[in-house]
Amino acid sequence: PFWHMMTCAAIVLTALSFILGRDIWKQKWQGRKGGTKYIVGQIVLGIALAFVLWGVFWVGDKLSQWVFPSFARMQVNSIYSIKDGFDPHVVGLLLLLLIGPAEEIFWRGYVQERLQRSCSKTWIGALIGIALYTAIHIPSCNFMLIVAAGVCGVVWGGLYWWKPQWFPALLLSHAVWDAAVFVWFPI
């Protein structure tokens, strides 16, 4: 089933990110000061960003239904059907505590960081990372999901490129947004 596959993928990709990116993670956390002000700021920023993104998607849903009346809703409903037959509490916890953080650790913390380090200009690495994050959703053949991944990729990837020290907030944002849009407040 889908949720078993996502759980396994999250665990494997997180482990690979830490194993293959030891140098990245060591450098990223070396000498970091994590005082209360920093931690509270990251939490507030992460939650606020998640709900701003939720609002963007709410508006996007209304616009897409206006532009593509039956197509958009059918595509969105097929995404939401993935949770059918599963306890929504379990799905929410998986998204919040494992899958969302794992995706951010892999895509921004490892893939995008590695690309930014290997390209002559960091913004080129960021764009490639965003494109890869979007492209990985193409096999779903779900246009709305691909667009959603592109929007989130631009936001999280762009912010990571601009302010890499916001990584904890981006990780929290991804986790909260996943649970909010998919379980707590479906659009």
Please identify what each model-predicted range represents:
Residues 1-27:
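Alpha-helical transmembrane segments in multi-pass membrane proteins
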Residues 8, 26, 46, 141, ...:
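Alpha-helical and His/Cys-centered functional microenvironments
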Residues 11-13, 49-57, 152, 177, ...:
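Alpha-helical transmembrane segments of multipass membrane proteins
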Residues 21-26, 62-70, 138-142, 165, ...:
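Transmembrane helix-loop junctions in multipass membrane proteins, especially transporters and channels
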Residues 26-99, 117:
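Juxtamembrane helix-loop-helix connectors linking adjacent transmembrane helices
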